[in-house]
């Protein structure tokens, strides 16, 4: 089967993998928008001022900790009714930096997860990342591919494409985590993002015939 997954908004995929003659096992994967997971510390060069204690959201440590707890409960409950172990990996969007991801996976509900993240050029500092359970999914390589603007539009810009390769159930799997511009952007901007994802997918499948 094809084992290249594109994780973006509105997708929840459940796949069965395994050798043809082996007992088949159910795995789940997911995508979740963290919706502005910011800490309370200013990142130099980033426009994160709204999410500071003296910013417009009055973003305090108490509010931050509450958001971490609430997110971890939701993420920790994903697909548990079908797969007791939870998702093998979860693509996430709108994480400010590695610090917030470290704080997130320290929460008891998802303490079994690790993460892959690269700092991108987004002006507000929000990025995509991949949370993964190392007991189910073993990461072998990863990289961030920057997006190109549509006709010079740097306002509605896709926040990079996180590519993560690894082993799931003994088979090679490659994931593209991406977060397109909102529906407030013009349709051609979103189509441009889709075409970039397709080009990446095609390139990956040409270079690895086993995907």
Predicted regions and their residues:
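Flexible glycine/proline-enriched surface loops and loop-helix/loop-strand junctions
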Residues: 55-56, 160, 181-183
């Amino acid at each position: 089967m094809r084992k290249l997954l594109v994780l973006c908004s509105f997708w929840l995929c459940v796949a069965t993998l395994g050798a043809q003659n082996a007992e088949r096992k159910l795995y789940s994967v997911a995508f979740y928008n963290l919706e502005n997971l910011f800490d309370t510390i200013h990142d130099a060069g980033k426009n994160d001022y709204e999410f500071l204690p003296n910013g417009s959201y009055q973003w305090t440590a108490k509010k931050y900790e509450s958001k971490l707890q609430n997110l971890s409960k939701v993420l920790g409950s994903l697909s548990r009714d079908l797969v007791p172990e939870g998702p093998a990996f979860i693509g996430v969007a709108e994480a400010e930096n590695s610090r917030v991801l470290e704080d997130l996976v320290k929460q008891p509900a998802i303490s079994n997860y690790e993460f892959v993240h690269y700092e991108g050029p987004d002006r507000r500092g929000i990025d995509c990342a991949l949370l993964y359970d190392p007991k189910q999914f073993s990461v072998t390589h990863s990289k961030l591919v920057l997006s190109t603007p549509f006709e010079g539009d740097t306002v509605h810009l896709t926040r990079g494409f996180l590519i993560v390769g690894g082993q799931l159930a003994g088979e090679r799997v490659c994931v593209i985590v991406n977060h397109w511009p909102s529906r407030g952007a013009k349709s051609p901007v979103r189509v441009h993002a889709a075409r970039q994802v397709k080009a990446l997918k095609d390139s990956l499948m040409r270079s690895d015939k086993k995907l």
